[in-house]
């Protein structure tokens, strides 16, 4: 490269950087992101959508000259690559994309080290090959660079071409997916049609809009939501209303549990024999097999939030992290004010995770038994926290000392991605799909099942079982779409988008003192739990703002919204813009008569719930049946075993 003609000009370096970033992004679409790409138009959009913003950003550096212009171009390209790779790793773990809201959850990463490290793949070097080559040239082969300035009069042309390409991209996107930016809640749609870089810009704009919404909110906004939710309220079932008044309420959170495990056998052995028994209808528990999680990016925290508030989580980020200082009318506070319940949460992790130590105060939760109340010695810990069997045993001992009535929420941890378990704790062989995540899930789910059985037996021994309402539920899916190939081997069937929606069943079991069990096939979600519990306790709900309906009410609403705008009814499901029959998961070509009504209801539910959170609307509510929670009243002391970790 001794001649001037063979040197790399700044514009050539610009083109190389744009092309390699575009190719890496296209690679990620097919290797790491599950975007459901079909047809020539969508593939063309995938090739087009990274280019516009990447070229626009990097073209700014064409105004510079000399070596620093190359360095600025390199740094800009590296930052875009880093954004792409950060999304790749995040998607592998959460099946979603990074937003400005999720940056508020970065403090959780330290506590999830093992799970995060499992998200790295051997081929990840592909994302940085070009970066290393460019860095080598900039440091060791500067003589290859033509440092003459690029003609500034052509820079606006490059920028204009980038903007024009963006609008062409948007036109294709709107043709293939109408009202993309105004109606969709699903980040996968946005990334598929706009690319991860334009999505980041879009998310930034939405974040600013949401922050402004609180400042502009008024009592009129609250009135609109109240009028909407009151139209949806259902009458309680007289056979169940008040039957659990002042009974203890125990809520058991099964981490990452999905009900495809119920009655599932691996190598001839039942994966969850105890839960199978509870699901039979012959025990005192009523089992809801068509109960779905409704979480978004907040995952576990979203499930807690939805079940204790009958609100949906946020479309971006976690309500715990972003709206933890809002005013709420939560289930624990209502139970306290109406019937004198004392509430607690028990969890084998530290209290700052998911901002729990702050948000629980706004829920009116009296006590938080975090990791400092348990022996966190290395032998007792696996993956993200305390082993479930030890957690349940110690928690039952704490509960035995409580004064009735209490509302107690237990959050398990062992059945958490990446589903690792000490060999001595494994009592079933892994499945043999070849996918470490799916195969490990079988073992950790069995361990969770055994831990739950030991806990229920412990409650009986301690005299707590008969006088308690006991709820059991899965918080969110454990196996994401990234593992569909392995799931097909495990289940012996094709995992289509419709089937994956079916797999979002996480189950709900409830034991009510004085009532026999059974199987209830109503379609329901986590948003329905709060009104159910209030009615069981004999509390009139007409003045409470809730989006769910009582599971035992004859008027229970069987339309189950998902956070991305999809939904399922007792007859069909709406997934990725298509309608499928629940009977056989086949595509329905004739639109059901109630489809538009249900779709509008789902969109309105999510919109109204978002308005409540973004506007902090409960601060305006003068509810005659509720006194606003004063969070300063609550303080969560460090437990007696704070120094047990070794």
Curated annotation (Swiss-Prot):
Compositional bias of kind Basic and acidic residues: 623-638
Similarity comment text for this entry: Belongs to the LTA synthase family.
Enzyme class: transferase
PANTHER family documented for this protein: LIPOTEICHOIC ACID SYNTHASE, PHOSPHOGLYCEROL TRANSFERASE I
Protein name: Lipoteichoic acid synthase
Any single GO BP term: lipoteichoic acid biosynthetic process
Keyword Cell cycle among record annotations: no
Residue intervals annotated with topology Cytoplasmic: 1-7, 65-68, 141-153
Listed Gene3D superfamilies: 3.30.1120.170, Alkaline Phosphatase, subunit A
Organism: Staphylococcus aureus (strain MW2)
Encoding gene (name): ltaS
Transmembrane feature ranges: 8-28, 44-64, 69-89, 120-140, 154-174
């Amino acid at each position: 490269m001794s001649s001037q003609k063979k040197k790399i000009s700044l514009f050539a370096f610009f083109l190389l950087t744009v092309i390699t970033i575009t190719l890496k992004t296209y690679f990620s679409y097919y290797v790491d992101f599950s975007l459901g790409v079909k047809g020539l138009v969508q593939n063309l959009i995938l090739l087009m959508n990274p280019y516009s913003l990447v070229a626009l950003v990097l073209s700014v550096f064409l105004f510079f000259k000399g070596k620093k212009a190359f360095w600025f171009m390199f740094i800009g390209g590296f930052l875009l690559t880093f954004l792409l790779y950060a999304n790749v790793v995040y998607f592998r773990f959460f099946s979603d994309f990074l937003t400005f809201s999720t940056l508020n959850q970065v403090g959780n990463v330290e506590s999830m080290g093992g799970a995060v490290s499992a998200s790295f793949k051997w081929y990840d070097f592909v994302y940085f090959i070009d970066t290393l080559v460019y860095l080598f040239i900039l440091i060791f082969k500067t003589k290859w660079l033509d440092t003459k300035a690029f003609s500034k009069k052509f820079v606006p042309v490059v920028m204009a071409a980038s903007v024009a390409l963006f609008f062409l991209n948007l036109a294709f996107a709107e043709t293939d997916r109408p009202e993309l930016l105004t109606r969709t809640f699903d980040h996968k749609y946005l990334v598929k049609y706009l690319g991860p870089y334009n999505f980041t810009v879009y998310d930034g704009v939405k974040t600013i809009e949401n922050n402004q919404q609180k400042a502009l909110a008024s009592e009129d906004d609250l009135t609109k939501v109240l009028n909407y939710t009151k139209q949806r309220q259902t009458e309680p079932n007289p056979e169940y209303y008040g039957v659990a008044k002042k009974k203890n309420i125990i809520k058991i959170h099964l981490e990452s549990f999905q009900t495809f495990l119920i009655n599932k056998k691996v190598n001839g052995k039942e994966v969850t024999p105890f839960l199978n028994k509870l699901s039979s209808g012959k025990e005192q528990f009523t089992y809801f097999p068509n109960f779905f999680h409704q979480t978004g990016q907040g995952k576990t925290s979203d499930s807690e939030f939805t079940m204790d508030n009958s609100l949906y989580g946020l479309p971006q980020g976690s309500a715990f992290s972003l709206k933890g200082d809002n005013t709420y009318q939560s289930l624990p506070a209502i139970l306290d004010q109406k019937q004198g319940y004392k509430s607690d949460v028990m969890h084998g992790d530290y209290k700052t995770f998911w901002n729990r130590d702050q948000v629980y105060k706004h829920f009116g939760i009296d006590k938080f038994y975090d990791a400092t109340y348990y022996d966190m010695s290395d032998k007792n810990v696996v993956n993200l926290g305390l082993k479930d069997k030890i957690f349940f045993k110690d928690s039952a001992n704490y509960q035995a000392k409580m004064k009735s009535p209490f509302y107690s929420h237990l959050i398990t941890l062992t059945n958490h991605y990446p589903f690792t378990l000490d060999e001595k704790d494994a009592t079933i062989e892994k499945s043999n799909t070849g996918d470490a995540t799916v195969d490990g899930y079988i073992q950790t789910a069995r361990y969770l099942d055994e831990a739950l059985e030991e806990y229920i037996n412990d409650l009986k021994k301690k005299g707590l079982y008969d006088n308690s309402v006991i709820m059991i539920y899965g918080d969110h899916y454990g196996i994401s779409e990234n593992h569909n190939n392995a799931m097909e081997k495990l289940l012996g069937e094709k995992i289509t988008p419709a089937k994956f929606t079916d797999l979002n069943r996480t189950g709900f079991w409830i034991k009510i003192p004085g009532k026999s069990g059974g199987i209830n096939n109503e379609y329901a979600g986590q948003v329905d739990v709060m009104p159910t519990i209030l009615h069981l306790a004999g509390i009139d709900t007409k003045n409470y703002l809730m989006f769910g309906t009582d599971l035992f009410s004859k008027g229970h609403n069987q339309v189950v919204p998902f956070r991305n705008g999809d939904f399922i009814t007792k007859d069909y499901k709406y997934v990725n813009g298509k309608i499928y029959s629940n009977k056989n998961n086949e595509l329905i070509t004739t639109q059901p008569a109630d489809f538009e009504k249900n779709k509008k209801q789902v969109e309105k539910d999510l919109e109204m719930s978002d308005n409540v959170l973004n506007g902090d609307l409960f601060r305006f509510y003068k509810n005659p049946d509720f006194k606003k929670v004063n969070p300063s009243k609550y303080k969560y002391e460090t437990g007696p075993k704070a120094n047990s970790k070794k």
